[in-house]
Regions:
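Structured, non-membrane catalytic/scaffold regions adjacent to prosthetic-group chemistry
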Residues: 39-292
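N-terminal export signals
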Residues: 17-37
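N-terminal secretory signal peptides
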Residues: 1-16, 27-29
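Small/flexible residues
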Residues: 6, 17-19, 203, 220
């Protein structure tokens, strides 16, 4: 199902709602309520056209500017998400049941690609922790593995060996349970477009974009760190943690500066993509250059 622009809240309407919400939240600043869902200074989101027409989605192509067209025939419904592994209550949900069970929140997050570009995206979704708690992880659940859909008949990039398919990613359990870690179901107040990972993707704003898999069908809680698709393809370049770190360059891209899509000038990249206050304590005592 291709989400037409007319099916997404028009940007002027969406931005008007955000201004009203911001004014309302501002009146509560004295009692400590956050003025943004991310807990950081408010960024202005990129436009819908920028967000939906410049995408890294190797399941379709390595050309970012054609993904939206190639994804038009992708069918995100019906859809089932399964949670299994080291949990006391494994289960599966239809996407419609997930949307009913978990209250949807609007959050504006920064997205930083390891290639040196960035965006600001207004996601809709719910905390991954809410889903995992319902399945009751046991004491052996140390990591969380995410598996994306495999449909080479629709996702023509999967017909090539660009990456090991299906796309697989992982987080530590404490990263997965962090309040910022979002299962995104929407964009600009409406359902996700296929090219942005419909119907369900991860959004982990303090990590590089490849740590946020799209079109997730399976979540598995495991004892050991899962081997991700990028680690299998180029483990010396793509580590398990992938925290945004301006002090640790990628072999092909410096990470000190970034270009926000729609802007000409580069800007300094912030540690943990600007979310250090919320997440740096997760990595206390770790060598972040070694654990990249």
């Amino acid at each position: 199902m291709h989400i037409r622009p007319s099916e997404i809240t028009p940007e002027p309407v969406w931005r008007g709602r955000r201004r009203l919400l911001g004014a309302a939240l501002g009146s509560f600043a004295g009692v400590g309520l956050p003025v943004s869902a991310a807990g950081t200074e408010v960024d202005h989101p990129n436009s819908l056209e920028q967000i939906s027409r410049y995408n890294n989605y190797y399941e379709f192509s390595t050309n970012k500017e054609v993904i939206w067209k190639l994804a038009e025939e992708f069918k995100p419904s019906p859809w089932t998400l399964t949670v299994e592994g080291e949990v006391d209550k494994p289960r599966s949900w239809a996407i419609e049941d997930l949307l009913k069970r978990f209250a949807q929140e609007d959050r504006i997050y920064r997205l930083r690609c390891v290639e040196g570009w960035s965006m600001v995206i207004p996601w809709r979704g719910f905390p991954l922790a809410s889903l995992l708690k319902e399945c009751m992880p046991n004491s052996r659940a140390k990591f969380v593995e995410f598996v994306s859909v495999s449909r080479p008949q629709e996702m023509i990039g999967q017909r090539m060996n660009t990456l090991p398919w299906p796309y697989t990613e992982g987080l530590r359990i404490d990263e997965a349970m962090h309040p910022l870690t979002l299962l995104a179901t929407g964009l600009f107040g409406a359902a996700l477009p296929s090219q942005n990972g419909a119907p369900l993707r991860l959004a982990v704003p303090w990590k590089y974009g490849f740590k946020s898999p799209k079109a997730i069908v399976r979540i598995r809680l495991v004892e050991s760190a899962p081997m991700t698709s990028w680690m299998r393809a180029a483990g010396s370049e793509y580590g398990f943690y992938a925290n945004v770190n301006p002090e640790v360059p990628h072999p092909r891209w410096s990470q000190r500066r970034e270009v926000r899509i729609g802007e000409l000038a580069k800007r300094a990249t912030l540690p943990f993509n600007g979310y250090a206050e919320q997440v740096a304590s997760l990595y206390g005592g770790m060598d972040l250059a070694r654990n990249f």
